[in-house]
Regions:
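Alpha-helical segment of the N-proximal tetratricopeptide repeat
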Residues: 2-29, 33
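Structural signature of tandem alpha-helical TPR/SEL1-like repeats
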Residues: 17-26, 51-63, 85-103
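Inter-repeat boundary and helix-capping residues of tandem alpha-helical solenoids
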Residues: 1, 34, 68, 75, ...
């Protein structure tokens, strides 16, 4: 079994160096070991968004919210991923989705469920 923390550090370094495809592959290695490793899902969402793969980015950002449903930041990140997807596609549905995710984040921050 690989050390997911070491793999994450390696993937993060690849991302910083601009090796985005390699970073995604390394993050996927992490998920093969631990499918609920939230940091890997969050990082994949960001990297896939940069690569223009907005559907995949959204899928991973949603997974973060499933793993950590009470974490306001998870929903804020989902909102940002939707905003970037809108910028890349001009699909107006992404704006509504972004607003919904941000509203959920704000409710959680205010202690509402």
């Amino acid at each position: 079994m690989a050390d997911v923390h070491a793999l994450y550090d390696q993937a993060d370094q690849l991302k910083l160096e601009g090796n985005l495809e390699e970073a995604v592959a390394k993050y996927q290695e992490i998920l093969a070991e631990d499918s609920n490793y939230v940091l890997a899902h969050a990082a994949i969402a960001v990297v896939q968004g940069r690569l223009g793969r907005h559907d995949v980015a959204i899928e991973h950002a949603k997974r973060v919210c499933e793993i950590a449903p009470e974490d306001p930041f998870s929903h804020t990140q989902l909102s940002v991923i939707y905003q970037r997807a809108y910028a890349g596609t001009q699909n107006p549905q992404y704006i509504q989705d972004a607003e919904d995710a941000m509203a959920r984040s704000q409710m959680l921050q205010q202690g509402q469920q």
